[in-house]
Amino acid sequence: MTLQLNTIALLLVILLILGVLSNNSTITISAAVLLIMQQTFLSSHIPLLEKYGVKIGIIILTIGVLSPLVSGKIQLPNLSGFVSWKMALSISVGVLVAWLAGKGVPLMGEQPILVTGLLIGTIIGVAFLGGIPVGPLIAAGILALFLGKI
């Protein structure tokens, strides 16, 4: 087996290093898996990841968010809890964020180079601002808003 040294492999190595340095296991694992796939016979499966990866990731994320409700760790509020201003605001923010993320997915597909910038920004936010790396889709949606794509 020979290693393919190209700009994508170099970018994945840089992301891997940045992920380790910023203690961001999401970036570290993602970059490592993709680097291994690119450098081995698994490269033939990359188009499947490209086609279904975001959808599968959103499904897994949704399962993770809903599981405390199903396990009983989070209780549904009674009816009066749904009519408070805080609940109305939280529902509105949820709708806005979901809409923004929905606008971000097409932008990421149309201009994949922007994904690199979003990832670098996410890594900086995690490493230096105490952020959490859950926002690339929303970040892409906000970027689409700024770029006038919405």
From Swiss-Prot:
Keywords: Cell membrane, Membrane, Transmembrane, Transmembrane helix. It is found in: Cell membrane. It is a multi-pass membrane protein. The chain crosses the membrane at residues 1-21, 52-72, 81-101, 123-143. Its main location: membrane. HAMAP family: UPF0756. Belongs to the UPF0756 family. This is UPF0756 membrane protein CGSHiEE_06715. The lineage of its organism: Bacteria, Pseudomonadati, Pseudomonadota, Gammaproteobacteria, Pasteurellales.
